[in-house]
Amino acid sequence: MTSSAMDNNESKVLEMVYDATILPDCSGMDPSIIDCINRHINMRIQRSYSSNIIAILDRFLMMNKDELNNTQCHIIKEFMTYEQMAIDYYGGYVNAILYQIRKRPNQHHTIDLFKRIKRTRYDTFKVNPVEFVKKVIGFVSILNKYKPIYSYVLYENVLYDELKCFIDYVETKYFQN
């Protein structure tokens, strides 16, 4: 039996994993099936953390000033520090975008945020994805204080891999045992 012939229904796969009576001795099982099951379990566990962090981030971007001042969540308190990082990094660009938004409030604004790349000693270039995502979160938070509809800017400017690195950073910092 190959992994392509296996039933991909999530609940059935998890039932198979947790119901030890239907699992044969692992020594005789096809290693690709075992790998497929292990990958599925790891993705499921990882997805639950990732979706929780994204939910916290989305909630943070929609919070008003009173809610932010009264929060006890350490993750949200950290997110609040990203605004100053964005101001330091983007400077006048923040003011220019806010001016455009005030000037034409009903228009959809395309906001492209730049990344500074650093040259390594091996003559290659790199961008620290965690720091970039922090600055974008701060930028979006500033925009949302004016009008809370600009969360799309985060997802338009940040690649999946960069967001994944940021989620890993938050998981490591706050969810490690």
Curated annotation (Swiss-Prot):
The keyword Ion transport does not apply. It holds the Pfam family Poxv_Bcl-2-like. Induction: Expressed in the early phase of the viral replicative cycle. InterPro entries: Poxvirus_Bcl-2-like. It comes from the Viruses. It is found in: Host nucleus. Disulfide bonds: none annotated. One of its GO terms (biological process) is symbiont-mediated suppression of host cytoplasmic pattern recognition receptor signaling pathway via inhibition of IRF3 activity. Keywords: Early protein, Host nucleus, Host-virus interaction, Inhibition of host innate immune response by virus, Inhibition of host IRF3 by virus, Inhibition of host RLR pathway by virus, Viral immunoevasion. GO terms for cellular component: host cell nucleus. Plays a role in the inhibition of host innate immune response. Within the host nucleus, inhibits activation of interferon-beta promoter by inhibiting IRF3 activation. Belongs to the poxviridae OPG036 family. This is Protein OPG036. It comes from Monkeypox virus. The lineage of its organism: Viruses, Varidnaviria, Bamfordvirae, Nucleocytoviricota, Pokkesviricetes.
